[in-house]
Swiss-Prot record:
UniProt-recorded name of the protein: Aspartate--tRNA ligase
One GO-annotated biological process of the protein: aspartyl-tRNA aminoacylation
Complex and partners: Homodimer.
CDD domains: AspRS_core, EcAspRS_like_N
Chief site of localization: cytoplasm
Protein biosynthesis among keywords: yes
Reactions listed under catalytic activity: tRNA(Asp) + L-aspartate + ATP = L-aspartyl-tRNA(Asp) + AMP + diphosphate
Family of the protein in this entry: Belongs to the class-II aminoacyl-tRNA synthetase family. Type 1 subfamily.
């Protein structure tokens, strides 16, 4: 049975004692990292979130404490009181390594079974074990540091936004389902049988209603939920730094958020973000980097060589050009020494992105070698080399297809080459860029209609208003994403505040008046009462913490995350509920083929 504190107070944390505390009597509380016997002495490494302190027990120091210490085991929770003394054998690898505590009294506050994972920094336990015993995983000091960073970050965000006249307003968690976008998490209503709430994918409509309400500047650190197939670094529930502003244009919102980013990264990481953050249009990003979230920590831009090869009698190039596509390439410095096998592997790699293959040209000391040598002339080869700014020792990697395939495959290849050839020299660099002028619509082959690239409330560029009905595929939007090191950190847009324009948008999306009224009627009703021009943005807080904490795993920055199948090993959620609960809700579970997707 564990002992009680009985008024005993902790006077220092385990990671705090230093040489200047020698001779001072202190009380520490924490968990036993390990204990060991050395001659007539018993040593215990005591750990809390701040670090580890060595505690020494001996017959001559205190016989009762010495006897009790013999029984402690790993992860026992204890309180120790004694005098800080200099260590005979210094451990320079520990901040407390110059001192130790001569223990005069120990209280065993609670005992521990043998833990399923050993609490250490270089933990090698399987992820499912870490998630099942997350409370033990979180005892590690490097995990504590991550959540200290998270706490500092949210404080810095709140401080900045409130200094800039933003108001923190909570929006509903139980809301209305909208089939546009990802699947909703649905919550059945007991009071309204057969009807459901939805957990919010974002506070989008409610924050726009707050602008109609005259709140002017709103923010919220909001929980959001999406029932989607989880890719790497996605969670079914996540946190957004959400905001909306009235009487603003795109540049106003970008300026506010540049200030926010600069403030947070300086306060939390000591990083000076260079302002203003550079801008790049969606079109330029796709043509140069094959991605709407380009990693700009290295070069290797995609180059259009269509003009150089348009007269070649090579069916792959010719058919791509005739179909309205293009021929584009990357220049891999020092790639001329690559053998046929690695080049073939790169060819297989681009095929996974729907490219038909990869042509290549290597510029060697003794001439040019190419997979399409029999189709090339000296003039065309020289023209390609000049356009690519290639030099002796380089390799030119070429894809020909419709533009969407060319961009996607070469964009992915660019990132793959960066990994293989270690092209990102400064892994600690924070390289920000704004991506602007996204398409307003994207065509869904599956549904045979245009869909909103972002959401149906995004405003089109003024100069493209006339093309919403006649040429929707080429209409640009007043949408913007903030990209950091090839990851989308946040995104937003100027919203449509004109009812007539909003109705045109819904019609272009193929939504009937009945559907629009059912899904968004309450927003459109509000827009009859003088909505201001407004816009906003949302940052992914979890992703921001990943960058600030230097981790690549989103589960590290969420206290109790789910696995890739949205399963919680700790609480074993989701779970089967009582039949009585289902009956109250008017729900019957249909039989389904059983499968285990927990892993």
């Amino acid at each position: 049975m564990g002992e009680s504190l009985n008024g005993l107070k902790r006077t220092m944390m385990c990671g705090e004692p230093r040489e200047e505390h020698v001779g001072k009597k202190i009380t520490l509380m924490g968990w036993v990292q390990r204990n060991r016997k050395l001659g007539a002495l018993e040593f215990v490494d005591l750990r809390d979130k701040t670090g580890i302190m060595q505690v020494v027990f001996g017959e001559e120091i205190n016989a009762e404490a010495f006897e009790k210490a013999k029984g402690v085991r790993s992860e026992y929770c204890v309180a120790v009181t004694g005098e800080v003394v200099k260590r005979e054998s210094v451990n320079e690898n520990m901040p407390t390594g110059f001192v130790e505590l001569k223990c005069e009294n120990i209280k065993i506050l609670s005992e521990s079974e043998t833990p399923p994972i050993y609490i250490k920094e270089d933990l090698d336990a399987a992820e499912n074990i870490r998630l099942k015993y997350r409370y033990l995983d979180l005892r590690r000091s490097d995990m504590h540091k991550i959540f200290e960073i998270r706490s500092k970050t949210t404080k810095a965000i709140r401080d900045y936004l409130e200094e800039n006249n933003f108001l923190d307003v909570e929006t509903p968690i139980l809301s209305k389902s909208s089939p546009e976008g990802a699947r909703d998490y649905l919550v059945p209503s007991r009071n309204y049988p057969g009807m459901f709430y939805a957990l919010p994918q974002s506070p989008q409509i409610f924050k726009q209603l707050l602008m109609v309400s005259g709140f002017d500047r709103y923010y919220q650190i909001a929980k959001c939920f999406r029932d989607e197939d989880l890719r790497a670094n996605r969670q079914p529930e996540f946190t957004q730094v959400d905001m909306e502003l009235s009487f603003v244009e795109q540049e106003d919102i970008m300026a506010v958020n540049e200030g926010l980013i600069a403030h947070v990264f300086k306060k939390v990481a000591g990083v000076d973000v260079q302002l203003p953050i550079k801008r790049m249009t969606f079109k330029d990003a796709m043509e140069k980097y094959g991605s709407d979230k380009p990693d700009l920590r290295f070069g290797m831009e995609i180059t259009n060589i269509t003009e150089d090869v348009k007269d070649l009698d090579f069916v792959v190039f010719k058919s791509a050009i005739e179909a309205g596509g293009s021929v584009r390439a990357l220049c891999l410095k020092c790639g001329a020494d690559l053998g046929r096998k690695p080049l073939d592997k790169l060819g297989e790699f681009v095929k996974t992105y729907k490219a038909k293959g990869l042509a290549w040209i290597q510029i060697k000391e003794d001439g040019v070698k190419s997979s399409i040598a029999k189709f090339l002339t000296d003039d065309v080869t020289n023209s390609i080399v000049k356009t690519m700014n290639a030099e002796t020792g380089d390799a030119i990697l070429i894809v020909a297809d419709k533009n969407s395939v060319v961009f996607q495959s070469l964009g992915a290849l660019r990132l793959e080459l960066a990994k293989q050839f270690d092209l990102i020299k400064d892994k600690n660099e924070f390289n920000f860029t704004w991506i602007t002028e996204f398409p307003l619509f994207e065509y869904s082959e599956e549904e045979e209609r245009y869909k909103a690239c972002h959401h149906p409330f995004t405003a089109p560029m003024d100069e493209d208003l006339d093309f919403i009905e006649s040429d929707p595929g080429n209409v640009r939007s007043k949408a913007y994403d903030l990209v950091l090191n090839g990851e989308e950190l946040g995104g937003g847009s100027i919203r449509i505040h004109d009812t007539a324009l909003q109705e045109r948008m819904f019609r272009a999306l193929g939504l009937t008046d009945e559907v629009v009224n059912e899904r968004f009627g309450y927003l459109l009703q509000a827009f009859k009462f003088g909505p201001p021009p407004h816009g906003g943005l949302a940052f992914g807080l979890d992703r921001m913490i990943m960058f600030l904490a230097g981790t690549e795993n989103i589960k590290d920055v969420i206290a109790f995350p789910k696995n890739q199948n949205a399963y919680c090993y700790l609480s074993e959620a989701p779970n089967i509920v009582d039949e009585k609960q289902l009956t109250e809700l008017g729900i019957a579970i249909l039989p389904k083929e059983e499968k285990n997707d927990k892993e």
